[in-house]
Amino acid sequence: MAAKEVKFSTDARTRMLRGVDILADAVKVTLGPKGRNVVIEKSFGAPRITKDGVTVAKEIELADKFENMGAQMVREVASKTADLAGDGTTTATVLAQAIVREGVKAVAAGLNPMDLKRGVDLAVAAVVADVKSRSRKVATNAEIAQVGTISANGEKEIGDMIAKAMEKVGNEGVITVEEAKGLDTELDVVEGMQFDRGYTSPYFVTNAEKMTVELDNPYILLHEKKLSGLQPLLPVLEQVVQSGRPLVIIAEDIEGEALATLVVNKLRGGLKVAAVKAPGFGDRRKAMLEDIAILTGGQVISEDLGIKLESVNLEMLGTSKRITITKEDTTIVDGSGDKGAIDARCKQIRAQVEETTSDYDREKLQERLAKLAGGVAVIKVGGGSEIEVKERKDRVDDALHATRAAVEEGIVPGGGVALLHAVKALEGLASGNADQEVGISIVRRALQAPVRQIAENAGHDGAVVAGKIGESKDLSFGFDAQTGIYTDMIKAGIIDPTKVVRTALQDAASVAGLLITTEAMIAERPKKDAGGMPGGDMGGMGGMGGMGGMDF
């Protein structure tokens, strides 16, 4: 076991605070509409430019082990806030730094760290309750766009695009962000359920120009096994021919005689038909077939359920308004499934999302949920260079998370104003003793930190701005750093999601409380470099002893 180095009390806290300051100072320059960028060197490829707090925090690793521990604890604040709310990472870092700084001073002055932490926790609970009570639901599409715009660093185009995407696919729908090939940022919306399997044979194509299969009002046969023999298929094919409607077969695989017969019938014009492989693999395939069955009002033909293909009638088949099949994917638009059954299925998938511990499974379940609930939107982010595209993609991701958070828990005035005005909730807050009272005061001061930092990044005096906002009785009154004027934040469209503000404060206080109560730190002792080795130490290398001190 390697030797360890141990630091105690003031020495430990001072080193730790230095690490906190280095990380927080690098992150906080990005806060607000006039926040600056940070350039990060990459071991390969071009440097990365970002204005995203958590991206900066994740890149910082300090040489001093004790300083690094402090920095890593605050990095944890940014990561946790990013995971829970998707935005507000810089605010969380600024709050954590403010609480730790004041807390370390108080401990150095001889106050009890545990009581300080209890005071901090009391104050945070009161502030969170106050912020929640002032939160209001997002009512209009314009407000969704405003949240997106603020989070995307004032880029209105991004805010509008996210609002449009959410309007199209609903709040449950999946919105993904990709890098575009060109200069422009575009929005692609796929309405209905789409899965990544195309036609099994190009002979099924109905639109030769686009090489797609387009079928209106088709029957949909869902089969979980392979189809290779013709005999079991004949009864259902005859019924479909008599109905005069098209047929789409979705099965594990369609091959041999079955596929040949379908192709011949299609070419002779006796039957409009197309065959597609079922999406997914293993248990996920079964679940997705079940989803399609519920969406289209059909049944999965499965021998586990005792249903044989020979005994299938038209009532067991699903239907939809339209199906479009390309070489790569299939889109089912407007399935005729029962709305109650679809809602119940969505509820079931949501419960699985809550329970699962695997990120991969969660992502797949959310995709299934979106396909059932509304559709998929893809925002393709363009730019003049690869570096610019990556930087914009970071901002679009942030904006998307912030917008989802706003829809979930509502909005409060932005620009750090909600936290600054929440100071009033701490007046008359009962504490157990004088040390806890100091803990409450620490939070009272820390709540000003985001407003001060936003103002300072815009070239104004943070203390003056915070003082002026604090004097106002109007809880929406704040400072628009973009224009440099005091205004009603809600009317100016400067709004933050309640969830982001709440999560930032809770995560910051949680980690800061642990840092304040630290009394000893243990780190591995750095290994001493064995400089240029003298000749004598190279025993066993015969006559090469004299080469020990050479630089190669």
Curated annotation (Swiss-Prot):
Tell me what gene encodes this: groEL
Question: What is the name listed in the Swiss-Prot or TrEMBL entry for this protein?
Answer: Chaperonin GroEL
* Location(s) in or outside the cell: Cytoplasm
Q: Name one GO biological process term.
A: protein refolding
Molecular-function annotations in GO: ATP binding; ATP-dependent protein folding chaperone; isomerase activity; unfolded protein binding
Q: Which UniProt keywords apply?
A: ATP-binding, Chaperone, Cytoplasm, Isomerase, Nucleotide-binding
This protein's record includes keyword Transmembrane:
no
Enzymatic reactions: ATP + H2O + a folded polypeptide = ADP + phosphate + an unfolded polypeptide
Q: Which leading EC class covers this enzyme?
A: isomerase
